[in-house]
């Protein structure tokens, strides 16, 4: 039986050692600010290493074992799956009380038959009850889900469930290391709204940037189940639509995109990562780049061209979740070469990014805002190229 509990402590130790070995000279960094990385690369390296080692050990080692135990699966339970004839996916879910919300959702949406189909070979990323509890009512527990009568809510819930299912059997070791993606059986509504994205490092698998596989490879007669700790919600808006809808944070960014005729980049199809500066981030720049009114009033073509290049410096033509950012990884943007690379630092809780002309790292928070054409990483400083 290849059922595998993610080896959290080994992952923690491996990542911590790899990071700390590259930063021995600054490992004694004492003044780490959780909201801001120091203004030199050396101290930033030490701070990042300390943050990652501490954050991974405290967060992963403390919570992962609890999550695996909470859903009733432990290493000793592996042999239990080998006893007697295998159950189908629905039967396995029904047999475990920690999947009661999932079972209620499957029944409410009429998907029990499809997920129990003996001729199918499916992969289900199965959220446990704790994952559903993070959703707003009426999707947050079995009782509320069972009571749903709204046709719109039922249709939405059905789409969400289908977004967790692959039409083929895929074991954890068949998911490629690094970044990859796969199409689910959810019918496509808009571009990429039925695709899920994997970030895999040292057998640790994260889906869509925020949902961890906490127990993998539960064999069923008609496929395999991977247990996850957050419900996957498919994207419905483009990067531009998300920015326009959040005027509190992104009104200056939207104005800048309009002034430079770059809105089409953020509405087009494809996969982009946008490091999106907030209104407060722009306010730190000198005039006329410091607010929407001043940007809208720019007429100097040289200034408009410079602003356009700065905005392109925030766009990576590939989808990077925070977990995909390496230690001082150089990432190529859409800005004019050769000064078109930014530096990123992995953070278990988000991460940091710096432009070559910045003397401070920008904190990514919030991270991994999923869009149909990419992902948004919200940052608190504008990135500046040389």
Tell what function each PLM region has:
Residues 3-5, 29-386:
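Mature, structured domains of secreted/extracytosolic soluble proteins
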Residues 23-27:
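C-terminal motif of bacterial Sec signal peptides marking the signal peptidase cleavage site
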């Amino acid at each position: 039986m290849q059922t595998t509990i993610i080896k959290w402590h080994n992952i923690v130790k491996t990542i911590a050692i790899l990071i700390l070995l590259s930063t021995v000279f600054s490992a004694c960094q004492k003044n780490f600010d959780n909201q801001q990385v120091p203004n030199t690369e050396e101290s930033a390296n030490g701070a990042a290493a300390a943050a990652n080692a501490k954050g991974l050990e405290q967060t992963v080692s403390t919570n992962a074992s609890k999550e695996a135990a909470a859903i009733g699966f432990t290493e000793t339970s592996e042999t239990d799956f080998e006893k007697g004839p295998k159950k189908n996916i629905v039967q396995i879910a029904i047999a475990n009380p920690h999947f009661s919300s999932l079972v209620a959702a499957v029944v409410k949406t009429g998907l029990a038959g499809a997920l129990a189909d003996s001729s199918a070979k499916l992969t289900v990323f199965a959220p446990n009850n704790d994952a559903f509890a993070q959703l707003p009512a009426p999707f947050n527990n079995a009782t509320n889900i069972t009571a749903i009568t709204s046709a719109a809510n039922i249709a939405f819930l059905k789409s969400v469930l289908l977004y967790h299912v692959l039409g083929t059997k895929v074991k954890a070791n068949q998911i490629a290391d690094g970044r990859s993606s796969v199409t689910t059986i959810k019918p496509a509504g808009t571009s990429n709204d039925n695709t899920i994205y994997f970030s895999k490092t040292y057998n640790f698998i994260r889906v869509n940037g925020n949902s961890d596989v906490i127990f993998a490879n539960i064999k069923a007669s008609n496929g395999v189940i991977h247990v996850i700790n957050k419900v996957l919600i498919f994207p419905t808006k483009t990067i531009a639509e998300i920015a326009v809808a959040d005027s509190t944070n992104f009104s200056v960014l939207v104005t800048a995109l309009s002034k430079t005729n770059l809105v089409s980049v953020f509405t087009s199809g494809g996969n982009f990562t946008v490091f999106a500066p907030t209104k407060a981030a722009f306010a730190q720049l000198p005039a006329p780049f410091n607010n929407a009114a001043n940007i809208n009033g720019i007429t100097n073509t040289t200034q408009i061209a410079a602003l356009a290049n700065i905005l392109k410096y925030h766009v990576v033509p590939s989808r990077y979740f925070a977990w995909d950012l390496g230690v001082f990884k150089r990432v190529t943007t859409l800005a004019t070469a050769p000064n078109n690379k930014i530096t990123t630092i992995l953070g278990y809780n988000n991460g940091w990014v710096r432009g070559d002309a910045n003397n401070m790292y920008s904190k990514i928070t919030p991270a991994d805002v999923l869009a149909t054409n990419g992902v948004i990483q919200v940052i608190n400083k504008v990135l500046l190229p040389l």
